[in-house]
């Protein structure tokens, strides 16, 4: 992660610090940990935060992951900010020419991406090595291919291949595929691939393929579009088949040990061991007439008035856990009566770290609201109650 170490200097900086498109507006001090602060900054019209941590012999200044910037922009921001310090060490050199310039899609702008996309969509959830996903994009140049993955090394590997092969129709999103599907409009996908997911036979609630996921997939698929599960785990296959048989709006196709053009490293290993591999295709048959409206999920704070005296109580609020979602106030930072609230919240399957800015006149999430899903919206409503001191304790 880009960062720099600086000698301790207890002389406060004079904000704002401005250079080019960068502005470092002010510094918020932690109410929970006096050695931590957040620098509130902007690049053009995008807000971001830097973490500033006072240690025994130095300051550590680095990015705040909840407000990401492109790596080179972040490095430039840190280089500019470091000019106000006596730097001990840093890793802010220019990127190697061999580094990938391709970036993942931002969850915060994913809704706009889907709305603007006019091409048929093919999705692979949990693409691993990326072999199948890359071939999918190469063989379907007029279609939009979307790979969804949570594993960062797999994503980095796929991004390098996308850039190397110049696959302009292939996009990568880091997130939980279950939540991503829930946020998508009806009938936007032709095919959804789930190849060799973790079986989670001892913790079945963690599986990708569940009754809820199947219903969302069939809603998102066009009529005659299909969800394809490929697995070497017989119990996962049998449980998934039972889920499909309970559904009244699908057609099922089953294959065993079918030969396919693209074989992953994982599959090649099982082939050598003569292990059975199961394919389950579930076709969507009906046109879902129920309107999809995630715009009903309002993530604004327009109805809340914050008492500054209540901030201490908010900070002491214990993590609140409900069925499927939670809210945890991790920290609060202050600058002249304005506050930054650091949060972990949302759906248990894919919780998010966010910051909310509280000023006398406005309250809003920095840069992005949570993904528009039902559990995230429930978590937002719970957060409103916490901030307004309703139903706490």
UniProtKB/Swiss-Prot annotation:
A Pfam family it matches: Methyltransf_4
Biological process annotations from GO: RNA (guanine-N7)-methylation; tRNA methylation
Pathway annotation: tRNA modification; N(7)-methylguanine-tRNA biosynthesis
Keyword Acetylation tagged: no
Binding annotation for S-adenosyl-L-methionine: 124, 149, 176
EC number: 2.1.1.33
Protein's job: Catalyzes the formation of N(7)-methylguanine at position 46 (m7G46) in tRNA.
Alphabetized HAMAP family for the sequence: tRNA_methyltr_TrmB
Protein name per Swiss-Prot or TrEMBL: tRNA (guanine-N(7)-)-methyltransferase
Protein species of origin: Helicobacter pylori (strain ATCC 700392 / 26695) (Campylobacter pylori)
